Amino acid sequence: MARSKIVKHIFVTGGVVSSLGKGILSASLGALLKSRGLRVAIQKYDPYINVDPGTMSPYQHGEVYVTDDGAETDLDLGHYERFLDEATSRASNMTMGRIYKTVLDNERRGDYLGGTVQVVPHVIDEIKARMLDLAKKGSFDVVITEIGGTVGDIESLPFLEAMRQLKLQLGSKNLVNIHLTLVPYIKSAAELKTKPTQHSVKMLLEIGIQPDILVCRSEHPLSKDIKHKIGLFCNLSDSDVVGLCDAETIYEVPLVLHEEKIDSLVLKKLMLKSPKPADIKDWKDFSGKVKFPKDGVVEIGVCGKYTKYPDAYKSIVESFIHAGAANNVKVKVRWMHSEDLEQKDCKVNEMLQGISGILVAPGFGERGIEGKIEIVKIARERNIPFFGICLGMQCATIEYARNVCGMEGAHSTEFVKKTKYPVIDLMEHQRSVKQKGGTMRLGSYPCILEENTNAFAAYGKNLINERHRHRYEFNNQFKEELSAKGLVIAGASPDGELVEIIELKGHRWFVGVQFHPELKSRVHKPHPLFISFVAEAKKFRDEMAVHHYETSSVETV
């Protein structure tokens, strides 16, 4: 069938409280529309004044998600990519900081012809132009735009005003606003309360926006009476009020929304026909594997410095869910704070009890670095499956240099500038860089794999492309010496100058990568390295169980 020439727009806003799951809602709706044969693009607008989240603390913002083209973006873009299996780009994430920067640059060039620069029209016009820009970058049927923040926040007002004007400009059949709210359950009264949702919609109405669809998060299903009440006070028909009951996993949300017929509702309001009915079989299969794994639980220790805030490692956690489903197991992450491992009274054996694999996570800064190096040593000496990502790979290199190659005090120049053995060093092109924001080696780069390695076995091919975010690299001055002692260069840049993957001879599964494989894992396409790592951890678990059984049997006799 012929596709509509007009791109349809869906704007997702949130009210009552933050962290309701606008990103998951947007990604889930996008996945449903894609399953109907529609081409979907998705973008996030963040109200903070930072240019991007690249320099923000993981404790405040969580993970920085890097795109193929090297943009440092909001972690919601990870949800978009994982759910839709579509690559995002720099154009997929916009901040108020970038908007203001553009407007000020325009003013300095004289683009406004001496006029007084104001929020309306100049800032709003720039926002509208950016919001429509993504639609021009491909032959899309639908563009979903998530607006960050909560309705009522002063920071989000320009984005909401831009949306209001766009709806007037494009027409109601070409732009739909879905408003996500909370319907809290009060245990003492044993009932759901609709008043917060009513007030949230009232705030939208005060700035000239009538939401087209309400999606109501709740602990319990919404009754027909509740939906009718919400619709009555929010100027909506009952069918425009969609219930979103809490799900066991985020991967059930597309199924819940499809059950509520939100995809059909959206298409009806946009007057858009889909090429085919929604196909959610893969989602049902995946959800079943996640909830009911056939082969039990595999516990993997993740060592990092931000473990008190798991959102800092969001893509790693999700990658384990994907790889676990592929291996018919549930991966249980046991967080291991790297600073705890530096304490003299650290009970390592207790910490490792039941662990079947160790992952040393990426990060920056000296804090906790010796703890990471210590856990690498333990994984190497005890032949525990090991996976090091970015800084984790660098820690593995340092540990091997110190404890196997006799390079006492070996380190990274990130932490010890004048170390005798700088096995990890600043990249040459980074030496003249002064600014921190957006200046690392960012984005997708090719890597050539060596055959007869765990990496090659996982990928099944020689050439791969992976995403990066780093300033420091393996120092090639020590490549020959480390290789002679059993360290394997399993992957490198096409020119051979940048070491991308290291492994160890004689170890069951020891892989360190300079890139970030977690950024390319998808719901229906788990990352090969995570699949391989979890598979080896599963084997380790089973072997330890047999060993424990045999040991117990001997002791009993």
From Swiss-Prot:
Quaternary structure and interacting proteins, as annotated: Homotetramer.
UniProt: CTP binding residues: S18, D153, I154, E155, K193, T194, K195, P196, T197, Q198, K229
PANTHER family: CTP SYNTHASE (PTHR11550), CTP SYNTHASE-RELATED (PTHR11550:SF0)
Annotated control of activity: Allosterically activated by GTP, when glutamine is the substrate; GTP has no effect on the reaction when ammonia is the substrate. The allosteric effector GTP functions by stabilizing the protein conformation that binds the tetrahedral intermediate(s) formed during glutamine hydrolysis. Inhibited by the product CTP, via allosteric rather than competitive inhibition.
Binding site for L-glutamine: Y59, G363, L391, G392, M393, Q394, E414, R471
Name listed for the protein in its UniProt record: CTP synthase
Sequence similarity: Belongs to the CTP synthase family.
Note: CTPSs have evolved a hybrid strategy for distinguishing between UTP and CTP. The overlapping regions of the product feedback inhibitory and substrate sites recognize a common feature in both compounds, the triphosphate moiety. To differentiate isosteric substrate and product pyrimidine rings, an additional pocket far from the expected kinase/ligase catalytic site, specifically recognizes the cytosine and ribose portions of the product inhibitor.
Span list, region Amidoligase domain: 1-272
All copies of domain Glutamine amidotransferase type-1, residue ranges: 299-543
UniProt: Mg(2+) binding residues: D76, E146
Amino acids binding ATP: S19, L20, G21, K22, G23, I24, D76
Binding site for UTP: S18, K193, T194, K195, P196, T197, Q198, K229
Keywords for the protein's UniProt record, in alphabetical order: ATP-binding, Glutamine amidotransferase, Ligase, Magnesium, Metal-binding, Nucleotide-binding, Pyrimidine biosynthesis
Organism: Chloroherpeton thalassium (strain ATCC 35110 / GB-78)
Annotated Gene3D superfamilies: 3.40.50.880, P-loop containing nucleotide triphosphate hydrolases
Record-listed E.C. numbers: 6.3.4.2
Molecular function GO terms recorded: ATP binding; CTP synthase activity; glutaminase activity; identical protein binding; metal ion binding
Catalytic activity of the protein: UTP + L-glutamine + ATP + H2O = CTP + L-glutamate + ADP + phosphate + 2 H(+); L-glutamine + H2O = L-glutamate + NH4(+); UTP + NH4(+) + ATP = CTP + ADP + phosphate + 2 H(+)
Domain of life per record: Bacteria
InterPro entries: Class_I_gatase-like (IPR029062), CTP_synthase (IPR004468), CTP_synthase_N (IPR017456), GATASE (IPR017926), GATase1_CTP_Synthase (IPR033828), P-loop_NTPase (IPR027417)
Active site: C390, H516, E518
Ligase is among the record's keywords: yes
Keyword Nucleotide-binding: yes
GO biological process terms, semicolon-separated: 'de novo' CTP biosynthetic process; pyrimidine nucleobase biosynthetic process
